[in-house]
Amino acid sequence: MLSDIIKNILTIDKRNLKENIRPMISELKERLNSNFDLLKEANNVDISKNNGFKLDLNIINNIFANVLKEPFTYGDITVSFKDDEKKIIYGKEIFDVGNVIVINEGNFYVTLELLLRNLLAGNTTIFVNYGYMFGSNNFLINEMESILKNYDISQNLFQIYVTEDYDEVLSYNANIDLIVCIGNKFLQNMILRKSKVKTIITGYDNFDLYIESKVNLGFLNEILKTGLNINLYIKDDLNLNHSQAMLVHDINEAISQINYTGNRYSSAIFTSNSLNASKFINEVKSKIITIN
């Protein structure tokens, strides 16, 4: 029950956390590499239930590499000013945010990266989703719990709660310090509207693709096989059959739809028309825009 999870996170002792963050990250990386066959078994169960995509160890290791580039962790003291005359050094200690709720669709790569980043920050974290890739995510959390136990740190530092009732989750606002919502625009708006605590929303790892010509279709098909969260918009006269795609009449309708219903994280156009490519770059509201 969520009430039990919330109760557990209120009594977590973090005294052993500071000096063990990076060793634990290194150990988690080693475990996922050495036990990748076991992770694949859990992943294959997800795939067999149409509840996940095939994991790639190279992507997993890239996530670790990127996170480990972060210079500071929970408990570090950073120097902001040094007064040589008075022989005083001014600085600040990095504290945790507190109790963080991460609401996302369950993508394993997102769970892994957010687990690592919240570990760096010393945050207690509950991952809330509707059960997508549950086997893979549960394997990850179990490995992390085992590592935490070995370092004499509460295993409740990271937990998963499976639900579609986000109202229940948000009702515990008195015990939540931050909500991070990662998903499509509908989910973002719903959480933002109902949340009573500080909330960060992002379309991270959600993509909008507009196809108006058949250039690079091989590359497109490879992208669609990755399991990424993709909104696909196809020009209606191309006769391309994708059941999840939205058909649009032209570049203007595509841009309007992406700006209205898109995730505003990453958008791409597949085109051979340089004018339309330029229009797409200038008018689409996304953090990342690419041309293919």
Question: Where do the language-model regions lie?
Answer:
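N-terminal Rossmann-like NAD(P)+-binding subdomain of aldehyde/semialdehyde dehydrogenases
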Residues: 1-91
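Conserved C-terminal structural/oligomerization subdomain of aldehyde/semialdehyde dehydrogenase
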Residues: 4, 8-27, 222-229, 236-292
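ALDH superfamily catalytic-core signature
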Residues: 30-34, 147-150, 185-244, 250, ...
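Conserved small-residue-rich beta-alpha loop and adjacent elements
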Residues: 69, 73, 78-147, 151, ...
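A structured beta-alpha segment of the ubiquitous adenosine-cofactor-binding alpha/beta core
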Residues: 85-92, 158-177
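Hydrophobic/aromatic ligand-binding patch that stacks against planar heteroaromatic rings
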Residues: 117-119, 190-191, 280
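Short hydrophobic alpha-helical runs that function as membrane-insertion/retention elements
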Residues: 124-128, 180, 199-201, 267-270, ...
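Short, structured coil segments at secondary-structure junctions
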Residues: 174-175, 194-196, 284-285
